Amino acid sequence: MSITTTRRRNQDSVCCKATRASIKVEAVSGQTVFEKQKLLHNFDELPEWQKDNDKILTGYVRETLSWKKCLYSLFYWNNETVNIYTHLVPAIVYFVFAITLTNYFLIPVFPSTSWSDYTVINIFLMGAFSCLMCSSCFHCMKQHSEKQSNFWSKLDYLGIISLISCSMIPIIYFGYFDHISYFSLFTIVTLVLATFCTVCVLHDKFNTSTFRPFRAMFFILFGFSGLLPLTTGFFKFGIQGVLNRIKVSFVFWEALFYISGAVIYGFRIPETLAPGKFDFFGSSHQIFHIMVVLGSVCHLKAIIDSYKLMHSHIHP
């Protein structure tokens, strides 16, 4: 065999190896591009810690380990998009209302109107803001990692406690405007219960999937603690007396929205009835979010109308 022929075969062999290597690199590169383009994943592709609702089958943002990627999920459609924006937009609205004292323009001014009135209204606005913003941040950031998911989940629960507490205080204030000792007593009771609830939600076991029905019942019971000042008012002022102080009708609608939302959330209706059909629209968590917003709007209306009732009573 000649030297020239041997060299030619060696060159051909090298070329073949280079070609195979090139094809391999292109395949790997193509796979990398594909992986970058694959933003959404199915339930069975998730790590175990992300598997919460097995009735939602598609549209997941898989563990990112990146704050940038979490924020980027705000700009493409996934099964958390509705959850994020149904609370982000109202949170911003409530915050603007609070910091600009928009309630100056929302409510009439009476001769007896004081800064205390605006303060308690803004307590509710900031409580609603903190609840909705914590919720929105949780749904955006929870896919970062298991550790961050647990952290933001606890903030989400603290936001709910904040909303419940900050909802009760203004109603108690307007209901007992001429009985400061009652207002102080029920405010202290509310804050003590809020502290107890805070200790509970900070416990890691509270955040597990098995505690889902318990979590729903937990927050319902905390909300029902508001019946204590209401019942006391019925005994002290009579039914008509309470109706002259508090806009009870909107409080009723608020409770209906909150309880209905919590029950739907706790039992995962409707996705339990039709898995995979409500991955992007109409899932229990999305319905719960909308119910919370509607309930908060009803409560704001109840507070403003109670303010009007109080000052109409002082200056008929």
Curated annotation (Swiss-Prot):
One of its GO terms (cellular component) is endoplasmic reticulum. Residues 1-89, 139-156, 203-218, 267-279 are lumenal. GO terms for biological process: intracellular zinc ion homeostasis. The chain crosses the membrane at residues 90-110, 118-138, 157-177, 182-202, 219-239, 246-266, 280-300. Glycans are attached at residues 79, 207. The keyword Membrane applies. It is a multi-pass membrane protein. Keywords: Endoplasmic reticulum, Glycoprotein, Membrane, Transmembrane, Transmembrane helix. It is found in: Endoplasmic reticulum membrane. One of its GO terms (molecular function) is signaling receptor activity. Induction: Expression is regulated by the zinc metabolism transcription factor ZAP1 via its promoter ZRE element (zinc-responsive element). InterPro entries: AdipoR/HlyIII-related. Its main location: endoplasmic reticulum. It comes from the Eukaryota. Residues 111-117, 178-181, 240-245, 301-316 are cytoplasmic. ADIPOR-like receptor involved in zinc metabolism either by altering membrane sterol content or by directly altering cellular zinc levels. Belongs to the ADIPOR family. This is ADIPOR-like receptor IZH1. It comes from Saccharomyces cerevisiae (strain ATCC 204508 / S288c) (Baker's yeast).
